[in-house]
UniProtKB/Swiss-Prot annotation:
Pfam families: Periviscerokin. Belongs to the periviscerokinin family. The keyword Chaperone does not apply. InterPro entries: Periviscerokinin. It comes from the Eukaryota. The modification Valine amide is found at V11. Mediates visceral muscle contractile activity (myotropic activity). GO terms for biological process: neuropeptide signaling pathway. Keywords: Amidation, Neuropeptide, Secreted. This is Periviscerokinin-3. GO terms for cellular component: extracellular region. The keyword Secreted applies.
Amino acid sequence: GSSGLIPFPRV
């Protein structure tokens, strides 16, 4: 759930 260039899933 990162709001950066690359959105990562919240694990």
